[in-house]
Amino acid sequence: GCITGMSFYILLSFLFKLDSFFCILTLIIKTKNIDENKSMMEQIENKDILLSYPFESMTSFINLLKEVAHNENVASIKMTLYRVAKNSQVVEALIDAAEHGKEVVVMVELRARFDEQNNIEWSRRMEDAGCRIIYGIDHTKVHSKICLITYTKDNKVKHISQIGTGNYNEKTSKLYTDLSLMTANEEIAKEVGKVFNKICMEEVMEKTKHLLVSPKCMQNKIADLIDGEIKKVEEGKTGYIGMKFNSLTDKVLIEKLIEASQKGVKIDLVIRGICCLIAGVKEYTENVTVKSIVGRYLEHSRIYIFGTEDDRKIYISSADLMTRNTVRRVEVAAPIYDENIKKRVSKMFDIMLQDNIKGRYMKSDGKYYRPEIAEGETLIDSQEYFFEEAYGKIE
């Protein structure tokens, strides 16, 4: 029989690299606002740094690990690993650090689906090099993406934390959209340290002030943040919620979002995959928009926004709003405190909402439709926009 439609493209995918069908977008190596010739540690001490993959390279984070491995003032590195590349520079840097006398503690999740064998092999190599390997918590997957560096400077103990939305994987950092925050904020470092300590004791966080940490301190805190926006509306102010993740199935949070919509909170959701909330239903979700973006790169970053520009709380997270993530895994969401980074993430979210090329909107029938484009309206492909921005073509 003849080959038609999707079958044709699936067949082609086995014959050619998919890159053959795309124009070449050279991945940027140097990141704006980062000086590759200066110490990454000092630059992070000076100000928080946010990397946006694949539009910016993971090289800056790898350079941080390499610097830390050889810095005599560094005492320890702690990291959670879920999926890593076959030839991981990240793991090689951790091995290098251990061989240079640093205390290296690595939580390796052996239940990462399809990566079990790779993780076992890397675990053995790291153990042989002197790293302390922890294999997680019974019945609770560790899916968080966190790294904590402890060092001394001016006779004081200091820390650098890295918290991300995606894996420490150089290969997927070129294929998935993700965010990575590096900060010297000691309050955040204190809580990241507690997360590691709890994992080592096979326990979970019961209380946090800055981070959102599942399975005990995320779902309820997100519900509280939603309640905060409802309260604003009840006081005659503007309530707003903007969220981006891969899937939405958490019934508790779906019901909270419906309640917020009914009270008049404006809600924008960018959800690539499964969404168990139907937008635009009269008297229920009239104030909710749901958009899916499927482009050249896999949308993978998770962003939580609460409030308008004057009073806005922003988090980046490893967690989708699925019950498996919010109550059955260890996930970490980090607040963005740097005002410039808050503006940047807000702008990124706004550009995604404006995407009228790769974006599709859900209507009240639960189906997705192309946006109607008015004559003369600017065409926006959010992923292409972010690439051009990274190259300095867009200010």
Describe each PLM feature range.
Residues K266-V270:
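Hydrophobic alpha/beta core scaffold segments
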